[in-house]
Amino acid sequence: MKIKALSKLKPEQGIWMTEVDKPEVGHNDILIKIKKTAICGTDVHIYNWDEWSQKTIPVPMVVGHEYVGEVVAIGQEVRGFEIGDRVSGEGHITCGHCRNCRGGRTHLCRNTIGVGVNREGAFAEYLVIPAFNAFKIPDEISDDLASIFDPFGNAVHTALSFDLVGEDVLITGAGPIGIMAAAVAKHVGARHVVITDVNEYRLELARKMGVTRAVNVAEEKLEDVMAELGMTEGFDVGLEMSGNPAAFNSMLTTMNHGGRIALLGIPPSDMGIDWNQVIFKGLVIKGIYGREMFETWYKMASLIQSGLDLSPIITHHYKIDDFQEGFDVMRSGMSGKVILDWE
């Protein structure tokens, strides 16, 4: 049987609607009928066919890894899932036999394979993934929110890396993940949550999500904002979401001594920084990749159930046949999360 899917068909700019074979369910897998998918920054890189994509993405391949759907078939070894369960899923498929997997640090598996990056993805009518990777969505969480659990998980993993209660938090990069991380920081009890960017559309989104200050660094100095907030000693926690060298260096300069930084943004490989800031301030820097399995997922559900409102971050909806409009608006930078409806 053939199904509709969005695929990277050619090694050039673009993504194409295609027909592919319906995937087969293995012993340990579940088959998910996709309801909604969201477009990730990674999908935009794949669309643009940038240097990273050219090195990483096999062609042809079905793309996408942010989704929600319904379980419609179950492999014979699978326990804990039933037909009709509403699920999203962890996009990092791990090996299960390396030291980190066996030691319970699954998110640090050295043999990780990415759904829609190294193997067939979720932008299709059906997706097969290992049942281990699926996560049941509580009834009170909407399909829209469930479809963005993957990037929300990046935000939660980064934000909750360090204690935030009563702390002053700087977030560099107001993309959707940065904005969600800011909302989490505020929700769990940070004092001042300041986010920086140069994209006024996204800074306005951050304001809607309740940050203390959203700062356009092209127009005002971070140091002036800190003075205005009565901050005399610098930020306690930094969440770097942009991969922008100037943003990271500005973070290092404005951190308090003993400050802690979680790094999710991917900088150019040869980024230079002022190491004196790190050493003489005694800063701690932690690299973040993916989500903790599955601690981050349970935290995500609990945060929403405890009143965290992410709805402003979802700005655009399109039917799947209009996917091109969705990619165009994502590439323009004038959007939050963009959702594609498969039903």
Swiss-Prot record:
Textual note on the cofactor: Binds 2 Zn(2+) ions per subunit.
Disulphide bond pairs: none
EC number(s) on file: 1.1.1.103
BP terms from Gene Ontology: L-threonine catabolic process to glycine
Name of one Pfam family that matches: ADH_N
Recorded GO MF terms: L-threonine 3-dehydrogenase activity; zinc ion binding
Transmembrane segments: none
Site (Important for catalytic activity for the proton relay mechanism but does not participate directly in the coordination of zinc atom): 150
PANTHER family, per database record: L-THREONINE 3-DEHYDROGENASE
Family, as annotated: Belongs to the zinc-containing alcohol dehydrogenase family.
Quaternary organization: Homotetramer.
Protein name as catalogued: L-threonine 3-dehydrogenase
Gene from which the chain derives: tdh
